[in-house]
């Protein structure tokens, strides 16, 4: 399966430790397309349907689309590098504007 930045995929986050996100849930890929084509891992951010308002830059709301059936928050402070084996399927994609906003919020989390 070809994986690109901005793709929303279903990922198995088990096993979890401490306050990490768990479950099989959607996540958005943020690693670059070149890396995604040669590495066996991807960098991604999990999504949650447990919506919390006014939490930027830690969360970013996106609307349902394609096979993402519910509005969701991207959990920007829960960045992960995981094996592609954990990815079950692609279900949607962020728009370019959403992806750019996501990266801006991620940068705020890292400073």
Predicted regions span which residues?
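Short, surface-exposed helix-loop/turn micro-motifs enriched in polar/charged residues
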Residues: 1, 19-21
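Short, charged beta-turn/beta-strand-edge "cap" motif at the junction between a beta-strand
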Residues: 14-18
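Short secondary-structure transition/capping segments
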Residues: 28-33, 89-93
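Compact nucleic-acid interaction/catalytic patches
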Residues: 21-23, 29-64
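C-terminal terminal-subdomain/extension
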Residues: 1, 64-111
């Amino acid at each position: 399966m070809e994986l690109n930045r901005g793709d929303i995929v279903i990922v198995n986050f088990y096993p979890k430790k401490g306050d990490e996100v768990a479950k099989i849930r959607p996540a958005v890929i943020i690693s670059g397309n070149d890396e995604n084509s040669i590495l066996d891992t991807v960098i991604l951010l999990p999504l949650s349907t447990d919506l919390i308002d006014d939490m930027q830059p830690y969360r970013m709301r996106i609307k349902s689309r394609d096979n993402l059936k519910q509005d969701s928050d991207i959990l920007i402070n829960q960045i992960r590098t995981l094996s592609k084996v954990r990815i079950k399927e692609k279900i949607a994609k962020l728009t370019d504007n959403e992806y750019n906003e996501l990266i801006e919020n991620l940068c705020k989390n890292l400073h």
